[in-house]
Amino acid sequence: DVYKGGGGGRYGGGRYGGGGGYGGGLGGGGLGGGGLGGGKGLGGGGLGGGGLGGGGLGGGGLGGGKGLGGGGLGGGGLGGGGLGGGGLGGGKGLGGGGLGGGGLGGGRGGYGGGGYGGGYGGGYGGGKYKG
């Protein structure tokens, strides 16, 4: 599998971080999430613990929590909730939803789901996934 995301580095950006598989979101981020797009990894983070994209174990924020914690405007659960996950487009996998993951730009779940551009690549500019 080839993940194409943000900047360099295996976890800090690119493969898993910065819009990568485990990061996703408008601002991206690795396993811990963070940034404007909210963390989709295990830690969440960003604007109000999840930010626009929500996600992570804690979830919360504008896009709703997509992780195990849920919360926020759209609610959560394992796959659903938020503007994208279960709302506009439906979330897939553990991360799901957010403004892009399954919503505006599509998204294929995993632990992070898509970002604004959707897909495993996530991130603001999208990203490409090849199986």
Curated annotation (Swiss-Prot):
Keyword Secreted among record annotations: yes
Key words of the record: Amidation, Antibiotic, Antimicrobial, Fungicide, Immunity, Innate immunity, Secreted
Gene Ontology biological-process entries: antibacterial humoral response; antifungal humoral response; innate immune response; killing of cells of another organism
Residue numbers bearing the Lysine amide modification: 130
Cellular localization per UniProt: Secreted
Claim: NADP is one of the keywords in the record: no
Protein origin, superkingdom: Eukaryota
Entry comment describing in which tissues the protein is expressed: Expressed in hemocytes and secreted into the plasma following bacterial immune challenge.
Location, primary (coarse class): secreted
GO cellular component term, pick one: extracellular region
Homology family: Belongs to the glycine-rich peptide family.
Protein role: Antimicrobial protein. Strong activity against the Gram-negative bacterium E.coli SBS363 and yeast C.albicans. No detectable activity against the Gram-positive bacterium M.luteus.
Protein's UniProt name: Acanthoscurrin-2
Source organism of this protein record: Acanthoscurria gomesiana (Tarantula spider)
